[in-house]
From Swiss-Prot:
Family, as annotated: Belongs to the peptidase M74 family.
InterPro entries documented for this protein: Hedgehog_sig/DD-Pept_Zn-bd_sf (IPR009045), Peptidase_M74 (IPR005073)
Location in the cell: Periplasm
One GO term (biological process): peptidoglycan metabolic process
Gene name of the record: mepA
Gene3D superfamilies: 3.30.1380.10
Source organism per UniProt: Salmonella typhimurium (strain LT2 / SGSC1412 / ATCC 700720)
Record's protein name: Penicillin-insensitive murein endopeptidase
Residues annotated to bind Zn(2+) 1: H110, H113, D120, H211
SUPFAM superfamilies named among the record's database cross-references: Hedgehog/DD-peptidase
Amino acid sequence: MKKTAIALLAWFVSSASLAATPWQKITHPVPGAAQSIGSFANGCIIGADTLPVQSDNYQVMRTDQRRYFGHPDLVMFIQRLSHQAQQRGLGTVLIGDMGMPAGGRFNGGHASHQTGLDVDIFLQLPKTRWSQAQLLRPQALDLVSRDGKHVVPSRWSSDIASLIKLAAQDNDVTRIFVNPAIKQQLCLDAGNDRDWLRKVRPWFQHRAHMHVRLRCPADSLECEDQPLPPPGDGCGAELQSWFEPPKPGTTKPEKKTPPPLPPSCQALLDEHVL
């Protein structure tokens, strides 16, 4: 478990040591009406909002990385979710990476988070607020067993499940990525109220946080939405396939060259960086 915790911490801080991308040279949001452009893994944003770092309901981690920008819809979602969590006595919501001031590609750690519609939220809800030192170097709490087959009972709580459910029930949310073991636990605990589980999608890693994705805003005409998740709660064969051993001969896919930017994003870079 210690090795896994170290690996998680390394994953959260590794991006600081990698070569910068052109998008990191844009230090303030691009003025204009808010527009998410392109796809979640190949896009940008005009008119991003800054998430206020001071709030009674949430705390923002790693503010030195300046990844607390997003579409106004994302900022409002975070404020809405954290207010609901506070009303229910769940604890302080810990906000991780959103996006950069103009969106675009990160130098590591994320393939998406490019259009201002994604946010990582820690799956721990402290009852006392974290210090500035804790926020700058957050300790991820690994909720998943070493073999990846189930959550760690001593670390899992109904409050965590409630936070994920609250996020999934938000009308602006289309997907929430969590580790397969976390999805499995949610399936076991959900009871008869299961419609929200459709949005909770199993994905690699995500052992200590959930990755929340919003739908494209109606007035962002160049934003590319994903297809909706398949019908149903996603607790059947699809989920179980994540726990099966890899088929013989299965290899990791090779890293692909990033696709060309959407023309509007390339024009934005040309004007503000290149």
